[in-house]
Amino acid sequence: MLDMRSMVTVHPALIAKPKGKTVSGDGADPKKRGRPKKNATEPAVRNPVTRAGVTRYMNPLVESLVRDNPFRGDNLVKESLLGQTLAEQTLVRANSRDNLLKESLVEQSFVDQTLQDQSLVDQSILRESLLRDNPRDTLRKESLRKYNSRANPLAESLLEESTTPKPRRGAHRKPLVLTKEMEEKLEALDRDMRTAEETKVSIAGSAGIPVTALPGMEALGVMQMVSSLGFLDAGDKPNVIKTMVVKYLDVFLSMGCSAPKPCLVNVPRGYRRFKQSSSVSPAYAAKLSSEDTEAWSGAAGVAVEAKMRHTAAVLESRNLSLEPYGSNPIKLERSALAAYMELMSMAEEAEGEDLEGIISDCRVLRTSTEWCRDLSQTVSSWWPPLREAISRRGTALSDYVSDREVDVIRGRSRVPALSCVLLYGKRVDDNDAPLTAPQTVLKPFDVTDYSRRLGGVWLHHARFPEYAPKRLFDPRPGAEPVLIRTCAGYLMTEERGPLRCWRKDAHMYQISLEIYNRLTTELNAVPPQTRCGRYNAKWLSTNGPTGVQKIVLAAARALTEPRLSWNDVFEV
């Protein structure tokens, strides 16, 4: 290869010509593309050759050097064609001095080129002989071809590629040579796996259960024995023995001797430590969960007592006396309902200030005992007398009900179905059937149920607050509003422990999908031109589509009670 720097006669400005530049010496400067470089000082003289009064030319040899440069990875075909045409043009315009220079340089380059070609040929011959005489490589190829059941075309192509010489990096690994023993072992392994699979399928067929429901490999021998004894008849009637054998076989097996644990010697140390430290014995897990429930029931009891005290204080401030209810919220609700009915019946013949006092007392009774009622109790017991009173007297709604209740009745709440039931006693679709089956029955207050609900944020009757769509994502960091923290409650399902994996568990995945959909519909309920809508859009753009999931997951981890079912919140 000619050394570019040795050619003193040719100016470097002429060697590497960009594609856009004109070769002809007409001096028409092409337009500069793109931005000008910062701090780029313009040279005083653009082209020293033109300044010296030398005619501008492009040497065909230099052109060919630029064209045939093996270190340029551009589109070589296009460039070579371009270079040929350029060379022809320049040859036509060449003068005698050019020709002299060209001849001397051509001779030099020709000598160098022949030397280079010779060395390349020698190298390739040497490489071919090496490849031909390498016994290990041929062995590997032969073994792969012989057992083509294990070698796929991809491996073949990879093998072919690997024979081409590449600059080696790092330690040189010897190519794998399969010995006879290795091949026998592989065949035996294949055979064993096939037979195990067949056994599994046959057992599953005789037991009449899906293959996926079968116990582990260590139980297969026993299963085979049991199926050969004829226990597992594939009958239509459910067979108690069969189900017991299938269900509890691996339990029985693990009682006698536990399955051999995998040896973790060769596994990296961090993983080994992690596996060793993350095992929890069943007894310890049970102890933890019992402590957990005790702590929770204690906290719930404290919360209920505080509520009772607050209700008693409110009723006392209004001079309302109920039947003695002790510390039982169920009795409190019943006695409050009795007093409420009595007051409502008194309101029929009362007038003027007496009527106003009675109505406000009724309102206090209803709103202060909200926490110890279920939605079904509200719908079936507390609202009918109120509806009758409103329809009987033409007084304003605001006399009878609080502002929040007015919002619910008028359908301004987040749950239009609920307001429809409360107002008209029927569902939205004009169906006279009750709202749902369990809500026709009076459900007593349940302390354990209430303590479960305290795991999330307590929203009365699980209605989303009115500001939920506006403030779904509060612009202040770390101030996600109630809705999301409540939604996190549904990620905890009945008796399943805290959230595990986002994707692996189908049930959890469905629930999280549902939450995600609800949250996004809430988000879309706000028009983006409003202030909160802009906040939402900004939040979403910064946090991406997984931001919602992250918030929900974080809130779910923050919850200390894992036994919330998602019926606890979506009961409407």
From Swiss-Prot:
Q: Where is this region: Disordered?
A: 13-45
Q: Which residues form a coiled coil?
A: 177-204
| Keyword terms | Coiled coil
Q: Does the keyword Coiled coil apply?
A: yes
Q: What is this protein called?
A: Uncharacterized protein 079R
Record organism: Frog virus 3 (isolate Goorha) (FV-3)
